[in-house]
A protein has these predicted regions:
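Active-site scaffold segments
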Residues: 307-353, 358-362
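Surface-exposed, secretory/extracytoplasmic low-complexity segments enriched in Ser/Thr/Asn/Gly/Pro
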Residues: 1-302, 307, 354-356, 361-364
């Protein structure tokens, strides 16, 4: 301040008075303070909502809240605008005790175990064994995994068996009720039939029990695993009919053959005699053989055919030289003994194209 009378100059230093109570209230309302007050102040190891084990380090980065408040008070009194908690020595320097070290080491083993690389392959579909899955396979005590005398985790075979059962329920095609988009335009519900894969659950349980603890499946590189089946199928996955199949529409008396999604053959047919209760059964079956120049025999008949494609027991697709007409409502009163009678020229085409194993979708 300038003195106009004596031409002298003086510097005035302001005096700062801190309202400690007000500062405390403001401090306690800070987000990091509230978070620190509710923070776990120890190591913790537990399964989260997804089911996998997670480790929380409550020791690292712990703040001495009282020390931090005093540092804040000093900062305000000195008219400073920023406070560095680290430079002010406001973090605890904590050395883990033996129990905490043991828990941290256990977590390292769990973390390695949970990083499983096994990926199930069901056709084009991929189904990884997740960290949560791995955690669910462990035998536990007080929420933590049990180890054997060699230090390895102990697996719960019942849990692994249940997991494989869930895979089978999801991906097995054999005996499944299917929704099929027909050529005539509607969606058909089809039950039964002989087609479809069936997982070998015993072998897959044994595979997981053997490999889950193998260090080779915890490398960080995905390893595709094609499961073992009791029954094989032409295609795998939930859509196991795929885009190559024979479709027999017994209401419209039509048969179609699709190959890789392309319609390769369409023909009228005659199916089982409905009046005589010999109607061709519905279901999703498959071509299990192919023969030429076969004589089909049954009670009271012996029918020679040039091309024979059986799809379910004694029921199959074949030419019928004794018929002059196909399609319409012939099957109602003059149908076959259960087979799909087909014009010879169309049957020859089908025989040359279709492979053993091809799904055959049969419905009314």
């Amino acid at each position: 301040m300038d003195n106009v009378l004596f031409h002298s100059r003086r510097e005035l230093s302001p005096t700062v008075t801190v309202d400690v109570d007000a500062l405390r209230r403001a401090y306690d309302s800070l987000e990091f303070v509230r978070a620190e007050q509710h923070k776990n102040k120890d190591y913790s190891l537990a399964r989260d909502t997804s089911g996998e084990y997670v480790f929380t380090d409550g020791l690292a980065g712990r703040i001495d809240l009282e020390k931090a408040f005093l540092a804040l008070e000093n900062t305000v009194e000195n008219g400073q605008e920023t406070l560095n908690l680290s430079d002010s020595g406001c973090y605890y320097d904590i050395t883990p005790n033996e129990n905490q070290k043991t828990l941290r080491n256990l977590w390292k083993e769990i973390e390695r175990y949970q990083s499983c690389d096994i990926v199930y392959c069901f056709g084009q579909e991929r189904y990884p064994v997740t960290a949560a899955d791995c955690a669910s396979f462990l035998v536990t005590e007080n929420g933590l995994p049990v180890t054997d005398q060699t230090g390895n985790f102990v697996l719960d075979e019942e849990a692994v068996t249940a997991y494989v059962g869930q895979l089978a329920e999801k991906y097995d095609g054999y005996g499944r009720t299917r929704q099929f988009h027909s050529t005539r335009g509607d969606v058909i519900t089809i039950e039964g039939g002989t087609y479809g894969s069936k997982l070998d659950q015993k072998k897959e349980t044994a595979y997981l029990m053997e490999h889950l603890l193998d260090a080779g499946v915890h490398t960080g590189t995905q390893q595709s695993h094609v499961p073992t089946y009791e029954r094989e199928a032409f295609c795998y996955g939930r859509d196991d009919i795929g885009d190559t199949y024979i479709e027999v529409d017994m209401t419209q008396q039509k048969m179609y053959y699709y190959e890789k999604g392309e319609l390769r053959l369409e023909t009228d047919v005659v199916t089982g005699n409905m009046r005589r209760r010999m109607g061709t059964p519905e279901g999703v079956n498959f071509v299990y053989n192919k023969q030429k120049d076969r004589v089909l025999r049954g009670p009271g008949y012996a029918s020679p055919v040039k091309f024979w494609v059986p799809v379910k027991g004694s029921i199959g697709i074949h030419d019928a030289s004794w018929r002059k007409e196909f399609g319409g409502d012939i099957y109602q009163t003059a149908g076959s003994h259960g087979c799909i009678n087909t014009p010879k020229d169309k049957m020859e085409e089908l025989y040359d194209m279709v492979q053993i194993g091809t799904p055959v979708v049969m419905f009314y």
